[in-house]
Amino acid sequence: VAADDLAPIGAFESDPVAVAERLLGVPHSLGARSSAATDCSGLVQQALYACGLAGPRYADQQAELGQAVDRSDARRGDLIVWLSPPGDHSWTGHSAFMLDADRVIHATGHHGAVVIEAFAEADARYRADGFHAPVFRRLQA
């Protein structure tokens, strides 16, 4: 490895979405969180860690991060979490990052990989599956 390709110890990324973008196409695998395979909350957790930010493992825990924002104010880097339907204890929800005002980046079983998708399409699919309306969380000022 060339020295120019190494970051100093303790150096962190500044944009979790840029970290997630480098993982586009990585296969989705429930419970995974690596560059070889990841699930939705694992992608969020990896991206936050790369930026020096604490990130819990599960979507319902991630829904408590940062400050609540309205959908109309959502922007790049905001976290979105669709919480699981009542009584469904097989998973805790689905998490994603806003890529911009209209698109998300997430690891999804529907597409089988980390993908960029229109927010409206993802939202319609998760709501049709019984998930709650998503919460939007601003992680950084």
Where are these regions (language model features)?
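Boundary regions of SH3-family modules and the immediately adjacent low-complexity/disordered segments
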Residues: V1-R22, V26
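Second-shell loop/turn segments in exported
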Residues: P27-S34
